[in-house]
Amino acid sequence: EGEGGASLGSTTARFQPENEIRGIPAGRVMDTAVMDLINTVQLENSGADVSAAALFKGTSDLPKGDINYGNIFDIYKFDNTLYRVSVTGAELKAYMEWSAECYNQWQEGDINISFDPEYPDYLYDMFAGVDYEIDLSQPKGQRIQNVMFHGAPLQDDQELTLAVNNYRYSSALKAQSIISGTKEWESSNSIRDMIVAYFAEHSPVAPEVDHNWKIVGVDLSEDDPRRAELVGYINAGLLDTPYAESYNLSDYDSLVAQAKAKAETLTVTVNGAAKDVATAFDAQGNTYYRLRDLAFALKGTGAQFNVTWDGSVAVATGSAYEGEALALPGIQDRADRFA
């Protein structure tokens, strides 16, 4: 048995994509296999037309291979039961608008999507059974666009059934008068137990994404080399994650100066002693780090080390670095593996 217990089934591949930007969860800016799995389970168990569920934390994922209870708990940590309730098209759209309030409004020049810090991960629901767009150029309450049900525009007076957990039903949909209907069915077991049963029946489970929703109304300047440079600084830990407020290209010069100033202050610990690490610099839109200080610090020690770059370097004698050769532009003839 692994750390999370006995195997409950297996997957054919990882379910969550890599984050493009450190600390900006891919699962909150695009449809993913994790959310489609949860909503599929809810739809199958409830018989509802539409399902809504949240990614309770941005790092929730299912790895490739055997799946245990710890993995299931990671993607669904609360002991919720499932309700089926009647809603109108207008009520469903109002619910979707409530959920989309978690995003900040996009401004011209923003390089990333950011989030209102007042809305934790578990308050952002994603929907299955309908196709829709979220226009982040619009203010809160005006973002849900082009809602389609079975290939046709969803009408405000259209009657639907919705699968939703008991907590969301009571704490939001009813407490905030988003819907008028009451539950017509409640599960006898938890949603987490339903996911366990799904793996028992369907393993190996492949990560499938239907891409039924997307964010529109934004231009993240993905072809602009300035954006690539800033993203490199964020991912290297030289700029803070722009989670609650997007970085904007209008602030490019000051952000670069901030990143380079932080690079000057970084240190590396070698056998318990702090050493200066050399500065970051740029070449053709890529961010590189001079490791000559590190090489000199280790020279003659025979130390092997792990490198985890998040704005710092951790060095521990006896732990081998298993990565690829570290490219050092301008001194390629001296670029060693340090292993």
Tell me the role of every PLM-derived stretch.
Residues 32, 36-260:
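Feature captures C-terminal
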Residues 22-30, 80-83, 179-183, 277-284:
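Second-shell loop/turn segments in exported
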Residues 257-339:
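Primary recognition of N-terminal secretory signal peptides and signal-anchoring hydrophobic helices
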Residues 11, 26-30, 35-36:
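Charge-patterned, long linear interaction tracts outside catalytic cores
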Residues 7, 12-15, 19-23, 131, ...:
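Short, solvent-exposed loop/turn motifs
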